[in-house]
Amino acid sequence: MALLVLVILFCLPIFLLFLLQKHRKNTRAKLPPGPPGLPLIGNLHQLDATNLAFCFWKLSKQYGPIFSLRLGFRPTIVISSAKLAKEAFKTHDLQFSSRPALSGTQKLSYNFLGLTLTPHYNSWREMKKKFVTHILSANRTEQFRQVQTEEIFRMIEKRFEDEGTAAVSRLHSVFAETQAMVGRVFFRDCLPFVGCWLDSLTGWNRRLRNNFSDCDKVYQQLIEDHLDPKRPKVAEQEDLIDVLLTEMKIADDHQTFDSIKSTIMENIAAMDTIKVTLEWAMTNLMKNPEAMKKVQKEVRYVVKDKGFVDEDDLPRLEYLKAVVKETLRFQPAAQFLPRETTERCVIDGYHIPAKTTVFVNVLAIGRDGQVWDKPDEFIPERFVGSNIDMGGQNFEFIPFGAGRRICTGLPIAMPIVELALANLLYKLDWTMPHGMEIDDLDYDANPGFTQHKKNPLRLAATKFI
Protein backbone atom coordinates (compact mmCIF):
# COMPACT_ATOMS: atom_id res chain seq x y z
CA MET A 1 0.00 0.00 0.00
CA ALA A 2 2.80 2.44 0.87
CA LEU A 3 4.47 1.74 -2.48
CA LEU A 4 1.19 2.38 -4.31
CA VAL A 5 0.77 5.72 -2.54
CA LEU A 6 4.31 6.74 -3.52
CA VAL A 7 3.68 5.81 -7.16
CA ILE A 8 0.44 7.82 -7.19
CA LEU A 9 2.10 10.82 -5.55
CA PHE A 10 4.88 10.71 -8.14
CA CYS A 11 2.66 10.20 -11.18
CA LEU A 12 -0.16 12.59 -10.26
CA PRO A 13 1.87 15.82 -10.69
CA ILE A 14 3.17 14.54 -14.03
CA PHE A 15 -0.37 13.76 -15.20
CA LEU A 16 -1.62 17.18 -14.11
CA LEU A 17 1.29 18.86 -15.89
CA PHE A 18 0.47 16.90 -19.03
CA LEU A 19 -3.15 18.09 -18.92
CA LEU A 20 -2.03 21.68 -18.36
CA GLN A 21 0.41 21.47 -21.25
CA LYS A 22 -2.27 20.05 -23.54
CA HIS A 23 -4.68 22.83 -22.54
CA ARG A 24 -2.08 25.48 -23.34
CA LYS A 25 -1.42 23.90 -26.73
CA ASN A 26 -5.11 23.95 -27.63
CA THR A 27 -5.72 27.55 -26.55
CA ARG A 28 -2.58 29.31 -27.75
CA ALA A 29 -2.60 31.93 -30.49
CA LYS A 30 -0.60 31.70 -33.69
CA LEU A 31 2.99 31.00 -32.67
CA PRO A 32 6.04 30.77 -34.92
CA PRO A 33 6.62 27.33 -36.48
CA GLY A 34 8.96 24.90 -34.82
CA PRO A 35 9.88 21.25 -34.41
CA PRO A 36 7.25 19.00 -32.83
CA GLY A 37 8.01 18.05 -29.26
CA LEU A 38 7.21 15.25 -26.87
CA PRO A 39 4.72 15.38 -23.99
CA LEU A 40 6.11 17.04 -20.86
CA ILE A 41 9.70 17.54 -22.04
CA GLY A 42 8.80 19.36 -25.26
CA ASN A 43 11.93 19.86 -27.40
CA LEU A 44 14.52 19.34 -24.67
CA HIS A 45 15.66 16.07 -26.22
CA GLN A 46 16.38 17.80 -29.55
CA LEU A 47 18.84 20.38 -28.22
CA ASP A 48 22.61 20.02 -28.23
CA ALA A 49 23.59 21.53 -24.88
CA THR A 50 27.26 21.56 -25.89
CA ASN A 51 26.58 24.24 -28.52
CA LEU A 52 23.13 25.80 -28.32
CA ALA A 53 23.86 28.59 -30.79
CA PHE A 54 24.84 26.17 -33.58
CA CYS A 55 21.86 23.96 -32.69
CA PHE A 56 19.52 26.98 -32.95
CA TRP A 57 21.21 28.02 -36.20
CA LYS A 58 20.63 24.58 -37.71
CA LEU A 59 16.97 24.63 -36.69
CA SER A 60 16.54 28.12 -38.19
CA LYS A 61 17.59 26.78 -41.59
CA GLN A 62 14.67 24.37 -41.39
CA TYR A 63 12.00 26.45 -39.64
CA GLY A 64 12.91 30.01 -40.57
CA PRO A 65 14.36 33.14 -38.91
CA ILE A 66 11.86 32.91 -36.04
CA PHE A 67 10.75 29.58 -34.61
CA SER A 68 9.19 28.18 -31.46
CA LEU A 69 10.48 25.65 -28.99
CA ARG A 70 9.01 24.23 -25.84
CA LEU A 71 11.68 23.58 -23.24
CA GLY A 72 9.56 21.49 -20.93
CA PHE A 73 6.97 24.01 -19.76
CA ARG A 74 9.01 27.04 -20.79
CA PRO A 75 7.70 28.61 -24.03
CA THR A 76 10.67 29.74 -26.09
CA ILE A 77 11.30 31.48 -29.39
CA VAL A 78 14.57 31.89 -31.28
CA ILE A 79 15.29 34.86 -33.55
CA SER A 80 18.00 34.44 -36.17
CA SER A 81 17.81 37.43 -38.53
CA ALA A 82 18.80 41.10 -38.35
CA LYS A 83 15.35 42.19 -39.54
CA LEU A 84 13.54 40.43 -36.70
CA ALA A 85 16.20 41.41 -34.14
CA LYS A 86 15.46 45.02 -35.07
CA GLU A 87 11.74 44.40 -34.65
CA ALA A 88 12.35 42.93 -31.19
CA PHE A 89 14.95 45.40 -29.89
CA LYS A 90 13.62 48.58 -31.50
CA THR A 91 9.91 48.28 -32.24
CA HIS A 92 9.18 46.17 -29.14
CA ASP A 93 12.17 47.12 -27.00
CA LEU A 94 10.19 47.57 -23.78
CA GLN A 95 8.46 44.20 -24.16
CA PHE A 96 11.89 42.54 -24.61
CA SER A 97 13.54 44.36 -21.70
CA SER A 98 13.55 41.49 -19.20
CA ARG A 99 15.83 38.48 -18.86
CA PRO A 100 14.82 34.90 -18.07
CA ALA A 101 15.18 33.99 -14.41
CA LEU A 102 17.34 30.88 -14.74
CA SER A 103 18.66 28.87 -11.81
CA GLY A 104 22.35 29.26 -12.61
CA THR A 105 22.23 33.03 -13.04
CA GLN A 106 20.00 33.46 -9.99
CA LYS A 107 22.33 31.54 -7.69
CA LEU A 108 25.61 32.97 -8.96
CA SER A 109 24.33 36.57 -9.02
CA TYR A 110 23.15 36.38 -5.40
CA ASN A 111 19.49 36.38 -6.43
CA PHE A 112 19.94 38.88 -9.28
CA LEU A 113 21.61 41.65 -7.28
CA GLY A 114 23.86 42.68 -10.18
CA LEU A 115 23.18 44.92 -13.15
CA THR A 116 23.51 42.55 -16.09
CA LEU A 117 21.54 39.47 -15.11
CA THR A 118 18.56 40.88 -13.22
CA PRO A 119 15.27 40.05 -14.95
CA HIS A 120 13.49 43.01 -13.35
CA TYR A 121 13.46 46.07 -15.60
CA ASN A 122 12.81 48.61 -12.82
CA SER A 123 15.67 47.22 -10.71
CA TRP A 124 17.94 47.22 -13.74
CA ARG A 125 17.08 50.84 -14.53
CA GLU A 126 18.02 52.00 -11.02
CA MET A 127 21.25 49.99 -11.04
CA LYS A 128 22.18 51.36 -14.45
CA LYS A 129 21.81 54.94 -13.18
CA LYS A 130 24.25 54.19 -10.37
CA PHE A 131 26.64 52.44 -12.74
CA VAL A 132 26.69 55.38 -15.15
CA THR A 133 27.09 57.90 -12.30
CA HIS A 134 29.79 56.14 -10.31
CA ILE A 135 31.62 53.97 -12.87
CA LEU A 136 31.22 55.64 -16.27
CA SER A 137 31.76 59.21 -15.08
CA ALA A 138 34.64 61.09 -16.74
CA ASN A 139 36.81 61.04 -13.60
CA ARG A 140 36.28 57.33 -12.92
CA THR A 141 36.83 56.40 -16.55
CA GLU A 142 40.16 58.24 -16.56
CA GLN A 143 41.23 56.50 -13.33
CA PHE A 144 40.30 53.08 -14.67
CA ARG A 145 41.99 53.92 -17.98
CA GLN A 146 45.34 54.35 -16.24
CA VAL A 147 44.92 51.07 -14.35
CA GLN A 148 43.89 49.25 -17.54
CA THR A 149 46.94 50.50 -19.41
CA GLU A 150 49.26 49.36 -16.62
CA GLU A 151 47.60 45.94 -16.52
CA ILE A 152 47.98 45.49 -20.29
CA PHE A 153 51.70 46.25 -20.12
CA ARG A 154 52.05 43.89 -17.16
CA MET A 155 50.20 41.17 -19.08
CA ILE A 156 52.63 41.42 -22.00
CA GLU A 157 55.68 41.28 -19.76
CA LYS A 158 54.29 38.21 -18.02
CA ARG A 159 54.34 36.37 -21.35
CA PHE A 160 58.05 35.89 -20.65
CA GLU A 161 57.65 34.80 -17.04
CA ASP A 162 56.47 31.59 -15.42
CA GLU A 163 52.84 32.26 -14.54
CA GLY A 164 51.54 28.72 -14.61
CA THR A 165 50.98 28.65 -10.86
CA ALA A 166 48.45 26.42 -9.17
CA ALA A 167 46.55 29.49 -7.92
CA VAL A 168 46.11 30.92 -11.43
CA SER A 169 45.07 27.51 -12.77
CA ARG A 170 42.57 27.12 -9.92
CA LEU A 171 40.95 30.50 -10.54
CA HIS A 172 40.72 29.77 -14.24
CA SER A 173 38.92 26.48 -13.63
CA VAL A 174 36.53 28.10 -11.12
CA PHE A 175 35.42 30.82 -13.52
CA ALA A 176 35.30 28.44 -16.48
CA GLU A 177 32.81 26.42 -14.44
CA THR A 178 30.89 29.63 -13.69
CA GLN A 179 30.49 30.27 -17.42
CA ALA A 180 29.12 26.75 -17.86
CA MET A 181 26.62 27.27 -15.03
CA VAL A 182 25.45 30.67 -16.32
CA GLY A 183 24.99 29.32 -19.83
CA ARG A 184 23.00 26.27 -18.79
CA VAL A 185 19.24 25.81 -18.65
CA PHE A 186 18.64 23.55 -15.65
CA PHE A 187 15.89 20.94 -15.58
CA ARG A 188 14.07 22.84 -12.84
CA ASP A 189 13.93 25.87 -15.14
CA CYS A 190 11.74 23.85 -17.48
CA LEU A 191 10.04 21.08 -15.53
CA PRO A 192 8.13 21.94 -12.34
CA PHE A 193 8.21 19.39 -9.52
CA VAL A 194 10.49 16.81 -11.17
CA GLY A 195 13.13 19.23 -12.52
CA CYS A 196 14.90 19.77 -9.20
CA TRP A 197 15.03 16.01 -8.64
CA LEU A 198 16.56 15.50 -12.09
CA ASP A 199 19.16 18.21 -11.42
CA SER A 200 20.10 16.41 -8.21
CA LEU A 201 20.18 13.04 -9.93
CA THR A 202 22.46 14.31 -12.71
CA GLY A 203 24.77 16.17 -10.33
CA TRP A 204 24.02 19.69 -11.63
CA ASN A 205 22.73 20.92 -8.26
CA ARG A 206 25.95 19.84 -6.59
CA ARG A 207 28.09 21.46 -9.29
CA LEU A 208 26.18 24.73 -8.95
CA ARG A 209 26.49 24.76 -5.14
CA ASN A 210 30.20 23.97 -5.29
CA ASN A 211 30.86 26.64 -7.90
CA PHE A 212 28.94 29.24 -5.92
CA SER A 213 30.95 28.36 -2.81
CA ASP A 214 34.25 28.60 -4.69
CA CYS A 215 33.32 31.96 -6.22
CA ASP A 216 32.06 33.36 -2.94
CA LYS A 217 35.39 32.61 -1.27
CA VAL A 218 37.23 34.51 -4.02
CA TYR A 219 34.91 37.53 -3.78
CA GLN A 220 35.07 37.54 0.02
CA GLN A 221 38.86 37.52 -0.05
CA LEU A 222 38.89 40.43 -2.52
CA ILE A 223 36.59 42.45 -0.27
CA GLU A 224 38.61 41.67 2.86
CA ASP A 225 41.81 42.69 1.07
CA HIS A 226 40.24 46.05 0.19
CA LEU A 227 38.97 46.54 3.74
CA ASP A 228 42.39 45.84 5.25
CA PRO A 229 43.39 49.04 7.11
CA LYS A 230 47.03 48.38 6.20
CA ARG A 231 46.24 48.52 2.49
CA PRO A 232 47.66 51.72 0.90
CA LYS A 233 44.91 54.18 -0.02
CA VAL A 234 45.75 56.07 -3.22
CA ALA A 235 42.77 57.88 -4.74
CA GLU A 236 44.22 57.73 -8.26
CA GLN A 237 44.50 53.95 -8.02
CA GLU A 238 41.01 53.19 -6.73
CA ASP A 239 39.45 50.22 -8.44
CA LEU A 240 35.85 49.08 -8.81
CA ILE A 241 35.72 47.36 -5.42
CA ASP A 242 36.98 50.51 -3.69
CA VAL A 243 34.20 52.49 -5.37
CA LEU A 244 31.52 49.96 -4.38
CA LEU A 245 32.69 49.81 -0.75
CA THR A 246 32.71 53.60 -0.53
CA GLU A 247 29.19 53.76 -1.92
CA MET A 248 28.04 51.15 0.59
CA LYS A 249 29.31 53.34 3.45
CA ILE A 250 27.73 56.60 2.29
CA ALA A 251 24.63 55.50 0.40
CA ASP A 252 21.23 55.28 2.00
CA ASP A 253 20.08 52.41 -0.20
CA HIS A 254 20.35 48.66 0.32
CA GLN A 255 23.88 48.13 -0.99
CA THR A 256 25.26 45.01 0.73
CA PHE A 257 28.30 42.78 0.53
CA ASP A 258 26.22 40.36 -1.54
CA SER A 259 25.38 43.06 -4.07
CA ILE A 260 29.08 43.94 -4.27
CA LYS A 261 29.91 40.27 -4.84
CA SER A 262 27.31 40.10 -7.60
CA THR A 263 28.89 43.11 -9.29
CA ILE A 264 32.34 41.54 -8.96
CA MET A 265 31.01 38.37 -10.59
CA GLU A 266 29.58 40.30 -13.53
CA ASN A 267 32.79 42.28 -14.02
CA ILE A 268 34.91 39.13 -13.96
CA ALA A 269 32.56 37.72 -16.60
CA ALA A 270 33.03 40.91 -18.63
CA MET A 271 36.81 40.63 -18.38
CA ASP A 272 36.46 37.02 -19.45
CA THR A 273 34.72 38.06 -22.68
CA ILE A 274 37.62 40.44 -23.36
CA LYS A 275 40.11 37.60 -22.89
CA VAL A 276 38.03 35.33 -25.12
CA THR A 277 37.84 37.98 -27.86
CA LEU A 278 41.61 38.47 -27.77
CA GLU A 279 42.19 34.73 -28.00
CA TRP A 280 39.89 34.38 -31.01
CA ALA A 281 41.42 37.46 -32.66
CA MET A 282 44.92 36.00 -32.37
CA THR A 283 43.64 32.63 -33.62
CA ASN A 284 42.09 34.27 -36.67
CA LEU A 285 45.22 36.29 -37.40
CA MET A 286 47.45 33.23 -37.15
CA LYS A 287 45.11 31.36 -39.50
CA ASN A 288 45.23 34.33 -41.91
CA PRO A 289 48.89 35.40 -42.25
CA GLU A 290 48.15 38.21 -44.71
CA ALA A 291 45.79 39.84 -42.23
CA MET A 292 48.42 39.43 -39.50
CA LYS A 293 51.06 41.06 -41.67
CA LYS A 294 48.73 43.92 -42.59
CA VAL A 295 47.61 44.75 -39.05
CA GLN A 296 51.13 44.58 -37.60
CA LYS A 297 52.38 46.86 -40.37
CA GLU A 298 49.63 49.38 -39.58
CA VAL A 299 50.24 49.38 -35.82
CA ARG A 300 54.00 49.70 -36.13
CA TYR A 301 53.74 52.43 -38.77
CA VAL A 302 51.34 54.53 -36.67
CA VAL A 303 53.12 54.10 -33.34
CA LYS A 304 56.67 54.07 -34.76
CA ASP A 305 59.34 53.83 -32.03
CA LYS A 306 57.26 55.23 -29.14
CA GLY A 307 57.55 51.88 -27.37
CA PHE A 308 53.86 51.28 -26.62
CA VAL A 309 50.37 51.85 -27.99
CA ASP A 310 48.06 54.10 -25.98
CA GLU A 311 44.43 55.11 -26.46
CA ASP A 312 45.41 58.24 -28.37
CA ASP A 313 46.72 55.97 -31.15
CA LEU A 314 43.53 53.91 -31.51
CA PRO A 315 41.55 56.28 -33.80
CA ARG A 316 44.28 55.89 -36.45
CA LEU A 317 44.30 52.08 -36.33
CA GLU A 318 41.47 51.45 -38.79
CA TYR A 319 42.50 47.96 -39.83
CA LEU A 320 43.04 46.85 -36.24
CA LYS A 321 39.51 48.00 -35.40
CA ALA A 322 38.29 46.04 -38.42
CA VAL A 323 40.08 42.92 -37.12
CA VAL A 324 38.30 43.25 -33.76
CA LYS A 325 34.91 43.75 -35.41
CA GLU A 326 35.41 40.81 -37.76
CA THR A 327 36.39 38.63 -34.80
CA LEU A 328 33.20 39.62 -32.96
CA ARG A 329 31.17 38.83 -36.08
CA PHE A 330 32.95 35.53 -36.67
CA GLN A 331 33.15 34.39 -33.03
CA PRO A 332 30.90 36.56 -30.85
CA ALA A 333 31.89 36.17 -27.21
CA ALA A 334 28.20 35.80 -26.32
CA GLN A 335 26.65 33.64 -29.04
CA PHE A 336 23.05 34.47 -28.17
CA LEU A 337 21.19 37.16 -26.23
CA PRO A 338 18.67 35.82 -23.66
CA ARG A 339 15.53 37.88 -23.10
CA GLU A 340 12.05 37.39 -21.67
CA THR A 341 8.93 39.18 -22.85
CA THR A 342 7.20 41.35 -20.27
CA GLU A 343 3.89 41.38 -22.13
CA ARG A 344 2.24 39.98 -25.22
CA CYS A 345 3.50 41.31 -28.57
CA VAL A 346 3.57 40.46 -32.28
CA ILE A 347 6.80 39.72 -34.18
CA ASP A 348 6.70 39.07 -37.93
CA GLY A 349 2.96 38.42 -37.67
CA TYR A 350 3.34 35.83 -34.91
CA HIS A 351 1.90 36.25 -31.42
CA ILE A 352 4.52 36.06 -28.68
CA PRO A 353 2.95 35.59 -25.22
CA ALA A 354 4.19 37.35 -22.11
CA LYS A 355 6.78 35.42 -20.08
CA THR A 356 8.22 33.82 -23.22
CA THR A 357 11.94 33.10 -23.16
CA VAL A 358 13.65 34.58 -26.22
CA PHE A 359 17.08 33.75 -27.62
CA VAL A 360 18.43 36.14 -30.25
CA ASN A 361 21.07 34.11 -32.08
CA VAL A 362 23.98 36.53 -32.56
CA LEU A 363 26.11 33.80 -34.15
CA ALA A 364 23.50 33.05 -36.84
CA ILE A 365 22.96 36.75 -37.59
CA GLY A 366 26.70 37.27 -38.00
CA ARG A 367 26.92 34.31 -40.40
CA ASP A 368 23.83 35.21 -42.47
CA GLY A 369 24.74 34.86 -46.15
CA GLN A 370 21.92 37.23 -47.14
CA VAL A 371 23.64 40.02 -45.20
CA TRP A 372 27.35 39.20 -45.34
CA ASP A 373 29.49 38.31 -48.36
CA LYS A 374 31.43 35.09 -47.74
CA PRO A 375 30.17 34.89 -44.14
CA ASP A 376 32.26 31.82 -43.25
CA GLU A 377 35.55 33.55 -44.08
CA PHE A 378 37.56 35.89 -41.86
CA ILE A 379 37.74 39.12 -43.89
CA PRO A 380 38.49 42.25 -41.81
CA GLU A 381 38.37 44.37 -44.98
CA ARG A 382 34.56 44.18 -44.91
CA PHE A 383 34.64 46.70 -42.01
CA VAL A 384 37.26 49.06 -43.48
CA GLY A 385 35.51 52.28 -44.47
CA SER A 386 32.21 50.89 -43.15
CA ASN A 387 29.85 52.77 -40.84
CA ILE A 388 28.72 49.55 -39.17
CA ASP A 389 29.42 49.68 -35.44
CA MET A 390 28.44 47.61 -32.43
CA GLY A 391 26.40 50.27 -30.63
CA GLY A 392 23.11 48.49 -31.23
CA GLN A 393 21.89 50.44 -34.26
CA ASN A 394 23.20 48.04 -36.93
CA PHE A 395 21.18 44.92 -36.21
CA GLU A 396 23.25 42.73 -38.51
CA PHE A 397 26.08 43.22 -36.01
CA ILE A 398 25.03 43.14 -32.34
CA PRO A 399 27.74 41.28 -30.38
CA PHE A 400 27.01 43.44 -27.31
CA GLY A 401 23.24 43.42 -27.67
CA ALA A 402 20.85 46.22 -28.55
CA GLY A 403 18.01 48.21 -27.07
CA ARG A 404 17.59 49.01 -23.39
CA ARG A 405 19.59 46.00 -22.24
CA ILE A 406 22.64 46.58 -24.43
CA CYS A 407 25.91 45.89 -22.59
CA THR A 408 26.46 48.87 -20.29
CA GLY A 409 30.20 48.31 -20.17
CA LEU A 410 30.68 48.61 -23.95
CA PRO A 411 32.45 52.02 -23.71
CA ILE A 412 34.98 50.45 -21.34
CA ALA A 413 35.35 47.03 -22.98
CA MET A 414 36.15 48.00 -26.56
CA PRO A 415 39.14 50.28 -25.81
CA ILE A 416 40.58 47.52 -23.61
CA VAL A 417 40.28 44.92 -26.39
CA GLU A 418 41.74 47.23 -29.02
CA LEU A 419 44.55 48.47 -26.77
CA ALA A 420 45.53 44.99 -25.62
CA LEU A 421 45.52 43.55 -29.14
CA ALA A 422 47.42 46.53 -30.56
CA ASN A 423 50.20 46.17 -27.96
CA LEU A 424 50.42 42.41 -28.46
CA LEU A 425 50.91 42.99 -32.19
CA TYR A 426 53.21 45.99 -31.76
CA LYS A 427 55.62 44.59 -29.19
CA LEU A 428 55.74 40.92 -30.18
CA ASP A 429 56.16 38.70 -33.23
CA TRP A 430 54.11 35.52 -33.15
CA THR A 431 54.80 32.04 -34.49
CA MET A 432 53.54 28.53 -33.89
CA PRO A 433 55.30 26.58 -31.12
CA HIS A 434 57.93 24.03 -32.14
CA GLY A 435 56.35 20.98 -33.70
CA MET A 436 53.02 22.67 -34.49
CA GLU A 437 51.61 23.97 -37.76
CA ILE A 438 48.98 26.64 -38.42
CA ASP A 439 46.62 23.88 -39.58
CA ASP A 440 46.75 22.51 -36.02
CA LEU A 441 44.74 25.54 -34.84
CA ASP A 442 41.04 24.80 -34.57
CA TYR A 443 37.81 26.67 -33.95
CA ASP A 444 36.34 24.21 -31.43
CA ALA A 445 34.56 25.86 -28.48
CA ASN A 446 33.44 24.75 -25.04
CA PRO A 447 29.77 24.82 -24.00
CA GLY A 448 28.67 27.86 -22.05
CA PHE A 449 27.30 31.36 -22.44
CA THR A 450 30.73 32.66 -23.50
CA GLN A 451 32.43 30.99 -26.47
CA HIS A 452 35.70 29.76 -24.95
CA LYS A 453 38.18 27.93 -27.15
CA LYS A 454 38.06 24.24 -26.31
CA ASN A 455 41.81 23.93 -26.89
CA PRO A 456 43.57 27.01 -25.46
CA LEU A 457 45.68 28.98 -27.91
CA ARG A 458 49.41 28.28 -27.60
CA LEU A 459 51.80 30.56 -29.50
CA ALA A 460 55.49 31.40 -29.38
CA ALA A 461 56.32 35.09 -28.94
CA THR A 462 59.54 36.98 -29.50
CA LYS A 463 60.07 40.61 -28.59
CA PHE A 464 59.98 43.03 -31.51
CA ILE A 465 60.49 46.19 -29.47
Could you tell me what each predicted segment is?
Residues V360-I388:
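Conserved cytochrome P450 K-helix/beta-meander segment immediately N-terminal to the heme-binding cysteine loop
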Residues S386-V417, D444-P447:
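Cytochrome P450 heme-thiolate "Cys pocket" and heme-binding signature region
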Residues T27-V147, E151, A167-V194, F449:
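Cytochrome P450 substrate-recognition site 1
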Residues P289-A291, L410-F449:
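Cytochrome P450 heme-binding "Cys pocket" and the immediately downstream C-terminal segment
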Residues M1-N26, P415:
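Terminal signal-anchor or tail-anchor transmembrane helices
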Residues P100-T105, E142-L278, K294:
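Cytochrome P450 heme-thiolate monooxygenase catalytic core
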Residues A2-L4, F10-F15, T246, T357, ...:
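C-terminal helix/juxtamembrane-tail motif
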Residues L44-W57, K61-G64, K217, D310-Y350, ...:
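Conserved cytochrome P450 K-helix E-x-x-R motif and the immediately C-terminal K′/meander segment
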